[in-house]
Amino acid sequence: MSSNHIEPADESTPDDLYTSDYEVGQDNLQGLGLDIHNPVFLISSVTIALFVLVTLLMPEQAAEHFSALRFYLTKELDWFFMYSMNGFLIFCVALALSPLGRIRIGGQTAVAEYHLLSWVSMLFAAGIGIGIMFYGVLEPMNHAMTPPLGLTDLDAQASRDLAMAATIYHWAFHPWAVYVVVGLSLSFFCYNKGLPLLIRSALYPLFGERIWGWPGHIVDILEIFATLFGLATSLGYGAE
């Protein structure tokens, strides 16, 4: 198989690119006008279809189990979520202040396709558009009435302060740090290193050619689950 890569947007030398024996689409299944990845599409689509089917056939039991799972995750892994978000933010600040922060996505001569205002508008619309419309008012009110962290003995002013602090934590710098890490991982390894625009490409420095096998398949399958159910939540808020 020939080496495969996506040409970057600037005059990067071949030494700057990752070359691979993998060819995009070599594992795909074609027919009936479709071009789907095997096994990522098959496993993810069948799993999602079964998940939706079980939810439709047993809505009450599904709601009970999902609620129990959500309660367990938020109660037992709250420390992990908090430290992870802080870690993402610290990482982004350190990255911006380091020499790596001067790397231009697409190469040194790359030019942005859209103006800054257009980029900012797309970031807000695609990133937190529906969520902030729904939760921008609901979340601080909900936290004020039922304070987080189990602090139920607060006075009114303390409850309001904590409610705003929790809301700012959820909608200010911390979530954007997560978006930045994912976005930079995709764009850097695609447009600067010539790899396919896949989450698994960001793991190439760690796993090398193994990302084209099951380690990479698992990463992409989990990515599909996270994207689908995340979008379903946002669309559900919009429908309400």
Summary of predicted features, one role per range:
Residues 79, 154-162, 211-221:
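Membrane-interface alpha-helices at helix entry/exit sites of multi-pass transporters
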